[in-house]
Amino acid sequence: MSNFLTVGFWFCERLYHSLVMVKKRSDCTIYQITVMNGDLEKLLYGNHRIYEMNGCLNVEACENEDQQILKLNIAEALSKLLRIPLKNVRQSGGS
């Protein structure tokens, strides 16, 4: 069963919004992100999932630094909204 959330997040000093589809599976919960901005949606393309495992949100490292910063900003907002800890993976020197 899928539910939907709306999440506001900051990126480059501007507030944006995303639609998040929540898919619960037996082994994890998947948060599939759609950014409500065409340019940012293109930036996130191919790397738009955040996984909740073992009670934490996990964000995989991205090759593109801007994509990593965007995904982490969305994940941080989602973490605050859901009150689920975020596993910190800021490996590319993000903001």
Where are these regions (language model features)?
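A generic structural signal for beta-strand entry/edge sites
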Residues: 4, 28-30, 54-58
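Residue-level recognition of conserved beta-strand positions in structured domain cores
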Residues: 20, 33-35, 61
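Short, cysteine-centered beta-strand-loop-beta hairpins and adjacent loop/turn segments enriched
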Residues: 14-16, 39-44
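Acidic, low-complexity intrinsically disordered segments
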Residues: 41-95
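Negatively charged, low-complexity tracts enriched in Asp/Glu with abundant Ser/Thr
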Residues: 1-26
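Short, surface-exposed, low-complexity cationic segments
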Residues: 24-37
